[in-house]
Amino acid sequence: MAKNKDVRVTITLECTNNCAQNNEKKKLGVSRYTTQKNRRNTPTRLELKKFCSYCNKHTIHKEIKK
């Protein structure tokens, strides 16, 4: 008996810093991580502090729509 919506979903986290628009950096792009979250425990958008290889520092990564 499967439910309509799964409790655990795979989400994508994207760097909120403007990595792609920094012209002084050597690498251009946007840092993205994939992870899972439980919809019952965290119904809101997830925000985690992760390492961005394009900024070379820890920045806030927010959940994005698929």
From Swiss-Prot:
Pfam families: Ribosomal_L33. GO terms for molecular function: structural constituent of ribosome. Its main location: plastid. Keywords: Chloroplast, Plastid, Ribonucleoprotein, Ribosomal protein. PROSITE patterns: RIBOSOMAL_L33. It is found in: Plastid, Chloroplast. One of its GO terms (biological process) is translation. Belongs to the bacterial ribosomal protein bL33 family. This is Large ribosomal subunit protein bL33c. The gene is rpl33.
